[in-house]
Amino acid sequence: MVLSAADKSNVQAAWGKVGGHAADYGAEALERMFLSFPTTKTYFPHFDLSHGSAQVKGHGAKVAAALTKAVGHLDDLPGALSELSDLHAHKLRVDPVNFKLLSHSLLVTLASHLPNDFTPAVHASLDKFFANVSTVLTSKYR
């Protein structure tokens, strides 16, 4: 799914509004995903998945950092996320459907924190962006 110039602008503007909250929003999205889709917990058997756990916060920060990197490389997501793609495909072997579940949780989290900025156009652009990130992260499964 190709991001248009308007999509790229929307993604960059929305992520800019996230600012210093990226790690917190990443952790919140993970917690939301674990609660809404309990099967996703199977990839984190060694984590304390309770509300506010340091491990969820730490992984949320990693998710946020990867997304921040992706936002900075919208024209080369495969290059920017190559190592992360290798990790998820070859070492962690995460079921690709889980990226869609996390994407949904991220959208809900962003909508709840940025209600005035989360217009239908921004929603659509972020959805396309997360879909592209998911596609890149699963590209090496083949």
Curated annotation (Swiss-Prot):
Q: Which GO terms describe its molecular function?
A: haptoglobin binding; heme binding; iron ion binding; organic acid binding; oxygen binding; oxygen carrier activity; peroxidase activity
Globin domain location, by residue? 2-142
- What quaternary structure, including any partners, is listed in this protein's UniProt entry? Heterotetramer of two alpha chains and two beta chains.
Q: Which domain of life is it from?
A: Eukaryota
Residue positions annotated to bind O2 are H59
Q: In which tissues is it expressed?
A: Red blood cells.
Task: Spell out the protein name for this chain.
Answer: Hemoglobin subunit alpha-3
